């Protein structure tokens, strides 16, 4: 995994742009999530789905190196017997995971949460996958989804550049439909190597 971090530099020294690069092997858990899927627990993020429209200073949708909330959510998910958390707005909309975006399938339609007012981080993996899906004749859209739509779907995934395309197998203990053939197609559309999923 290649990670590039850039900052505008130290404010008090006028040093200019500062950056560093790290290269580390992908964790085995990333491949395991692609193969076996994830059991996910929903967690209230504590803000409405449009909270960041009125409060841009909260920096919703900004990638930072402050991972305390993300790590705390993952620990809470594990305490609940899940692999991962799915943040939910205070008004009941599915948002994103701490380090991954959400894709939900309804037939030939792929849906993800919009960025902007939701505070959801823009995802390179979503952009790549949705562009390829539309070229393949699918409909890909950004819209708000109730948590129930994740379970009442034709499949759902948490996606990121590190994790790849990981199917959600259950949400809050409720089984989420899984189609192994479509999972392979979605993995291919996103540009990740195929990893045979375990049913």
Regions found by a protein language model. Name each.
Residues 1-5:
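Ordered, amphipathic secondary-structure segments that act as subunit-interaction surfaces
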Residues 7, 12-199:
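Helix-start/capping segments and mature chain N-termini
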